[in-house]
């Protein structure tokens, strides 16, 4: 980072409102702070204590690069937004951002921010800041006490105030004091108790009435710093007055007091009066500063109270508005609730009506089904098998029977079982079959299954009769008493002893074969037209 061209130099350029350049001479150590023993003195305006007395220092390393070191400052040093550790050197590159302290409240950037730049010295001539002179940077020497001062302080005993840093009268003035004016000196008012009492009262007033300000209250902070300065000045003047009195006491007690001239005594008295007047002025100024600080504090309290009152009013307005919105919302919810209750009530009423209608329809359906069952049982039932017509057949006399039942009946009689009219024609009644099927479809599943089983059983019986014919052997003279049925296969029709069964009662034969009682079929139906007693054989 050494200069490459003539006239080029390194400097710290301030960022923000004020454009200032701090020159960094090669090979020299540059210090920044608010104290007197620094290269460039920084005077903060927003917060006086933001910058330390010796805040940081800049110097070049062996490679010619500039480095920055935090001198254990209170508010720190930042390089490119990163805080540096105290007493540790950090190298800087061109364009590096150096921040001293932290940003004050309600501000985004710190008051002192610098950027390391490299420019021609001619361009920087108008914005360069002059460093402090060497005499201000020199350290102050400590005051040396003579043997007489040491003895005097030892004779007087311990004092509550420190004596260094204050002016003392010369030895010539001490020798010019005269004993003839001792009474005049004793008539002078004593300043020590007055000054110390005033100082104690001022300290009490400051501690009782002044509250330590925060960094947000910059005005009160500045005023408080002035108050502290005046208090220091009052202490210094008070110590000077005490020293003068101690010197006068020494002069009075010395053996050379008779040799003191009147002029020197008057000079000392004049100096004491001047110090007393100066102290009085400082006290008045201090009281005025305390009064101003109190007024500032009261103004801040009033402003805070007014802001608090405004905030409370604003919060009350927001609360009232929120309550109003809540009330409106509750009203809307109540209206919606009432509407929903009305809708639910209407739906319940509609549901009840629908339920009643369904019950009525179901009752009507039950009534229709019962009527259909009555019709099926009374009008569409075969008189032979007492079941609903299966393949209904209508005779010439208009009576209807099952096809299987009438065929079985015709094997014994060729006349209608109801009206005894001769059977001439048989007609299939598809209308009855379709009507019965439609009505059965609307009945219970048990009825449907029962009818399907009957139809299947009838088909099996027809197929069995077609495959195995039955031979009926009967005696015409004794048919009503004894009847024999012998069944055999078609291949061996002459043998009649394989499978047979016998029934003795005529009623049982009629119920088994035709499904009707003897009240409808009498014994005359089975009498033969032939009067001769002979055996007859019927093969089915």
Curated annotation (Swiss-Prot):
Work out whether the entry's keyword set contains Acyltransferase.
no
| Broad class of where this protein is predominantly found | nucleus
Q: Where is the composition biased (Polar residues)?
A: 152-162, 179-200
Q: Where in the cell is it found?
A: Nucleus
Q: Using the UniProt annotation, give all residue ranges assigned to the region (Disordered).
A: 128-205, 517-540
A single MF term (Gene Ontology) = ubiquitin protein ligase activity
Q: What class of enzyme is it?
A: transferase
Q: Quick one: which pathway?
A: Protein modification; protein ubiquitination
Q: Please name one Pfam family that this protein belongs to.
A: zf-C3HC4_3
Q: Tell me how this protein assembles.
A: Homodimer. Forms a E2-E3 ubiquitin ligase complex composed of the rnf8 homodimer and a E2 heterodimer of ube2n and ube2v2.
Give the comment on domains: The FHA domain specifically recognizes and binds ATM-phosphorylated MDC1.
User: PANTHER family of this UniProt entry?
Assistant: E3 UBIQUITIN-PROTEIN LIGASE RNF8
Name this protein carries in UniProt: E3 ubiquitin-protein ligase rnf8-A
Q: Which organism is it from?
A: Xenopus laevis (African clawed frog)
Per UniProt, what is the name of the gene that codes for the protein in this document?
rnf8-A
């Amino acid at each position: 980072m050494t200069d490459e061209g003539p006239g080029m130099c390194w400097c710290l350029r301030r960022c923000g409102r004020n454009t200032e350049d701090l020159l960094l001479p090669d090979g020299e150590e540059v210090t920044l702070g608010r104290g007197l023993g620094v290269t460039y003195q920084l005077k903060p305006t927003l917060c006086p204590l933001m910058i330390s007395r010796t805040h940081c220092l800049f110097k070049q390393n062996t490679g010619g690069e500039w480095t920055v070191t935090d001198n254990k400052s209170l508010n720190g040093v930042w390089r490119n937004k990163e805080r540096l550790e105290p007493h540790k050197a950090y190298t800087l590159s061109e364009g590096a951002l150096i921040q001293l302290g932290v940003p004050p409240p309600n501000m985004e950037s710190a008051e002192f921010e610098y950027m390391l730049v490299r420019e021609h010295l001619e361009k920087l001539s108008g914005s360069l800041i002059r460093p402090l002179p060497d005499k201000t940077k020199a350290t102050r020497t400590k005051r040396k006490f003579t043997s007489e001062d040491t003895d005097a302080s030892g004779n007087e005993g311990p004092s509550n105030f420190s004596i260094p840093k204050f002016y003392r009268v010369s030895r010539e003035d001490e020798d010019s004091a005269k004993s003839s004016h001792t009474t005049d000196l004793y008539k002078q008012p004593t300043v020590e108790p007055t000054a110390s009492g005033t100082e104690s009262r001022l300290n009490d007033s400051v501690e009782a009435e002044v509250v330590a300000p925060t960094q947000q209250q910059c005005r009160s902070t500045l005023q408080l710093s002035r108050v502290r300065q005046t208090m220091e000045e009052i202490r210094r003047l008070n110590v000077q007055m005490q020293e003068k009195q101690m010197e006068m006491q020494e002069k009075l007690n010395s053996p050379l007091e008779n040799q003191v001239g009147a002029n020197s005594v008057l000079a000392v008295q004049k100096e004491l009066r001047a110090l007393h007047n100066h102290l009085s002025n400082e006290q008045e100024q201090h009281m005025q500063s305390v009064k101003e600080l109190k007024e500032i504090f009261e103004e801040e309290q009033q402003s805070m109270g007014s802001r608090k009152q405004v905030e409370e009013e604003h919060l009350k307005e927001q609360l009232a508005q929120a309550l109003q919105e809540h009330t409106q919302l509750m009203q809307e919810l109540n209206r919606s609730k009432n509407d929903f209750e009305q809708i639910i009530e209407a739906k319940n009423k509609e549901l009840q009506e629908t339920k009643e209608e369904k019950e009525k329809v179901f009752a009507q359906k039950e009534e229709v089904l019962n009527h259909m069952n009555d019709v099926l049982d009374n009008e569409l039932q075969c008189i032979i098998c007492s079941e609903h017509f299966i393949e209904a057949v209508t005779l010439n006399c208009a009576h209807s029977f099952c096809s299987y039942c009438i065929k079985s009946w015709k094997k014994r009689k060729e006349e209608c079982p109801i009206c005894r009219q001769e059977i001439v024609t048989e007609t299939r009644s598809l209308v009855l079959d379709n009507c019965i099927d439609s009505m059965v479809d609307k009945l219970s599943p048990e009825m449907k299954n029962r009818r399907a089983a009957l139809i299947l059983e009838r088909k099996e019986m027809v197929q069995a009769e077609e495959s195995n014919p039955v031979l009926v052997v009967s005696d015409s003279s004794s048919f009503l008493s004894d009847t024999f049925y012998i069944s055999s296969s078609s291949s061996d029709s002459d043998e009649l002893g394989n499978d047979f069964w016998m029934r003795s009662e005529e009623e049982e034969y009629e119920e088994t074969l035709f499904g009707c009682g003897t009240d409808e079929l009498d014994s005359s139906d089975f009498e033969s037209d032939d009067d001769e007693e002979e055996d007859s054989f019927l093969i089915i």
